[in-house]
C-alpha cells in the first residue's frame, strides 16, 4: 500500500504546508476598538520576506501552526486569528521592521495577565525564521482593561493614607542588602525614618534567609516604623518583601504584615510571577495594604533593543495585574534608562489617557478608563546632587529612593536621611517659586548647604560621582 501523501476525505481541506502570509498577512484589515494591538520589532532570517515574518508572528501567537490541520475546519479562523495588518521598516536599522498585529479579544481570558503573555509572547520568540523579536508595545482596549482590578489603591488614595501632598516621597533601600541581623536591620530603618524619609525598603532578594528570617524582620521593622512615627508626627512605612517560594507562603507573610498594622508590603512581580502578583494585589486591596513592586529580572527581558519585551509593556502589565509603586529607573543614576523612553512609560503608569508619541516610544494611544495609576520609583545610584533633576523629571507623584545615597553619608544613617529631605524640600520650594531646576539645580543645593551641615557633608562626599554611559535602548528615529 502506497503511503498517504494527501487527504481528500473532506471538501476544502488539503494537507500540506503553505506560507503564513497567505492567511495571516492582511494589510487591508481595519482594526477594531476591541482588538489588542501589538507592535513587534522583527528581524527576519536572511531570505525571509518581512511579510512572511510578520505573518508568522501573528500566526504562532494566535491560531496558527506550521502546517494545515484538519481541525481548522471546525472553527472560524477569520474570527479568532491574529492578523499582521501593517509593516514598516525601522529607520537606520538594516533588516528590522515594526510589524503591527491585531488580536481578537476572544483569544484572552478575562483578568489574566498570565494568559495574555502566554498567548502573545509565550512561544513565538523561539521561532527559527526570526533572528530576533521584540515586543515594543501593546494597546490594551478598555473592553479588556475593565476585566482587571488594577492597582490596589492608586496614587490619590496613597497620598490620603499617608497625608503627604505636594512633593515626591522619599525612600531608602537598606544596605547592605544581605547579611544584617533583624535587629540591626530594624535599627537602620528607624534611623532613616527618624531622619526624615517617608519609606525604607527591603531589597529585592531579602526574603527569609538564615541570617534574618522574615518574621523577625517584619517585627523589628514594625517597631522602627512606630517609634519613628511617634517622634516625627509623620506616617512612615517600610516595604516588607512578602515574596516567597509559594503563593501560600507569600500570602501568610502579607497577612502577618497586616496584623502588625504596617501600611505597605512588597513583591518581586517578575520573579514571583503575574498570577502570584495579582493574588497579592487583590489581598492588599481588601485589607488596606499598599503594594510596592520591584522589577527584579526586568533587564534580562527588556534591555536588548532587538530582542525581548520592552519595559513599557511590562509596566502596562503591572498596572493591570496590580501594584501601587513600581521601579522605573532614574535617567540620571547607575541603571539603564533613556530620558524620553522613561518618561513615556512613566506616563503609561500614572496617567489616565496617553496619546501615541513615537518620539517617546509610545506606539499606541492608551485609554485606561479611570484605572488607578501607579507611582514610579526612581532608584539606583542616586544622591543629593541628583535631587533637582529627579524632581524635575518625575514630578510630585513619584518616590525618590536613595539607598547608598542615604546610608553612605559620612555621619551615619539619620544625617543621610536629613540631607535627602533638606535637598528635596529645597528643590520643591525653588520649583514652586518658578525657578528652573534643570538650569539652577546646583545653585539651589549649594544654597541649602549653608543652613544644613548634613547636606553639605553629603554634597562633599558625592560631588564627583557620575554614571555617564550611553543607554543601550534608545528611541528610533522617526
UniProtKB/Swiss-Prot annotation:
It comes from the Eukaryota. Its main location: plastid. Its cofactor is Mg(2+). The modification N6,N6,N6-trimethyllysine is found at residue 14. The disulfide bond which can form in the large chain dimeric partners within the hexadecamer appears to be associated with oxidative stress and protein turnover. The modification N6-carboxylysine is found at residue 201. Its EC number is 4.1.1.39. HAMAP family: RuBisCO_L_type1. NCBIfam families: PRK04208.1. This is Ribulose bisphosphate carboxylase large chain. It comes from Neurachne munroi. The gene is rbcL.
Amino acid at each position: 500500500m502506497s503511503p498517504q501523501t494527501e487527504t481528500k476525505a473532506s471538501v476544502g481541506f488539503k494537507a500540506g504546508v503553505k506560507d503564513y502570509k497567505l492567511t495571516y498577512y492582511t494589510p487591508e484589515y481595519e482594526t477594531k476598538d476591541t482588538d489588542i494591538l501589538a507592535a513587534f520589532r522583527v528581524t527576519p532570517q536572511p531570505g525571509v520576506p518581512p511579510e512572511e515574518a510578520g505573518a508568522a508572528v501573528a500566526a504562532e501567537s494566535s491560531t496558527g501552526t506550521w502546517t494545515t490541520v484538519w481541525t481548522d475546519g471546525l472553527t472560524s479562523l477569520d474570527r479568532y486569528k491574529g492578523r499582521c495588518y501593517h509593516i514598516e521598516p525601522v529607520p537606520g536599522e538594516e533588516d528590522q521592521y515594526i510589524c503591527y498585529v491585531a488580536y481578537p479579544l476572544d483569544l484572552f481570558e478575562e483578568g489574566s495577565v498570565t494568559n495574555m503573555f502566554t498567548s502573545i509572547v509565550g512561544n513565538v520568540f523561539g521561532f527559527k525564521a526570526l533572528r530576533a523579536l521584540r515586543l515594543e508595545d501593546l494597546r490594551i482596549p478598555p473592553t479588556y482593561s475593565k476585566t482587571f482590578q488594577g492597582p490596589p489603591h492608586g496614587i490619590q488614595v496613597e497620598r490620603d493614607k499617608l497625608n503627604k501632598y505636594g512633593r515626591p516621597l522619599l525612600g531608602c533601600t537598606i544596605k547592605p542588602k544581605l547579611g544584617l541581623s533583624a535587629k540591626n536591620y530594624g535599627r537602620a530603618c528607624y534611623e532613616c525614618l527618624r531622619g526624615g524619609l517617608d519609606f525604607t525598603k527591603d531589597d529585592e532578594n531579602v526574603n527569609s534567609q538564615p541570617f534574618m528570617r522574615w518574621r523577625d524582620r517584619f517585627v523589628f521593622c514594625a517597631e522602627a516604623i512606630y517609634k519613628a512615627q511617634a517622634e516625627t508626627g509623620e506616617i512612615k512605612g517600610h516595604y516588607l518583601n512578602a515574596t516567597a517560594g509559594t503563593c501560600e507562603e507569600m500570602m501568610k507573610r502579607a497577612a502577618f504584615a497586616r496584623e502588625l498594622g504596617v501600611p505597605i508590603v512588597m513583591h518581586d512581580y517578575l520573579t514571583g510571577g503575574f498570577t502570584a502578583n495579582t493574588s497579592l494585589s487583590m489581598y492588599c486591596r481588601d485589607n488596606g495594604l499598599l503594594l510596592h513592586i520591584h522589577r527584579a529580572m526586568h533587564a534580562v527581558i527588556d534591555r536588548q533593543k532587538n530582542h525581548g519585551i520592552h519595559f513599557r509593556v511590562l509596566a502596562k502589565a503591572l498596572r493591570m495585574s496590580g501594584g501601587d509603586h513600581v521601579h522605573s529607573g532614574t535617567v540620571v543614576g547607575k541603571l539603564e534608562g533613556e530620558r524620553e523612553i522613561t518618561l513615556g512609560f512613566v506616563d503609561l503608569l500614572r496617567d489616565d489617557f496617553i496619546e501615541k508619541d513615537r518620539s517617546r516610544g509610545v506606539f499606541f494611544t492608551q485609554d485606561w478608563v479611570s484605572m488607578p495609576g501607579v507611582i514610579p520609583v526612581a532608584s539606583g545610584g542616586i544622591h543629593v546632587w541628583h535631587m533637582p533633576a529627579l524632581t524635575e523629571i518625575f514630578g510630585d507623584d513619584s518616590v525618590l529612593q536613595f539607598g547608598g545615597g542615604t546610608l553612605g553619608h559620612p555621619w551615619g544613617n539619620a544625617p543621610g536621611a536629613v540631607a535627602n529631605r533638606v535637598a528635596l524640600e529645597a528643590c520643591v520650594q525653588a520649583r514652586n517659586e518658578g525657578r528652573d531646576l534643570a538650569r539652577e539645580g546646583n545653585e539651589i543645593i549649594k544654597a541649602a548647604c549653608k543652613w544644613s551641615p548634613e547636606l553639605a557633608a553629603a554634597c562633599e562626599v558625592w560631588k564627583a560621582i557620575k554614571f555617564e554611559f550611553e543607554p543601550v535602548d534608545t528611541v528610533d528615529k522617526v
